[in-house]
């Protein structure tokens, strides 16, 4: 905390991408107090990411949430807990793996809407007839964070050709 108070925006952005957000975070009132990236564009101190998105009355949406439900565990080196079988999101740490049933429940609410036991009626992205594209969890082993490039990955011919070109144009 650096002592800076952010004034809420009057209207939401069209792009509601929030780094670090997990599926269930999109419905938590006041999530900006937990995530400084969302705090910068939340419309109120008690706003939800989904609520701000729905305030735009979307006719088309893209929704790619879920990667952080497992990715934070993977990128932290396995520091966290696999919460499979534990539906209590209040017990989850930042690097914990979200229970698959919890993920399914929240993802369904985000897209289709419904009733949440604590947050009440939730209007989902597709509930008012909006069309969209959805994505969920990529294979974490295929993301750039876990993809290695071997030492000296360029073929010798390419290196020699590049050196010749540099010499030709006086850069070497």
What role is predicted for each listed range?
Residues 140-172:
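Acidic, Ser/Thr/Gly/Pro-rich low-complexity segments that form flexible
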Residues 45-50, 116, 126-129:
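Conserved nucleotide-sugar donor-interacting segment of glycosyltransferase catalytic cores
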Residues 56-61, 126-132:
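Loop/turn elements at helix/coil->beta-strand transitions in domains of secreted/extracellular proteins
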Residues 63, 105, 120-123, 127, ...:
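A taxonomically broad motif for mature regions of secreted/extracellular
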Residues 1-106, 141, 146:
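Conserved SGNH/GDSL esterase-like catalytic core that processes O-acyl groups on lipids
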Residues 64, 135-136:
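Alpha/beta-hydrolase-fold catalytic nucleophile elbow
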Residues 111, 122, 126, 130, ...:
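Feature captures the catalytic ectodomains and active-site-proximal regions of enzymes
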Residues 106-118, 170-172:
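Short, intrinsically disordered, charge-balanced linker/junction segments flanking boundaries
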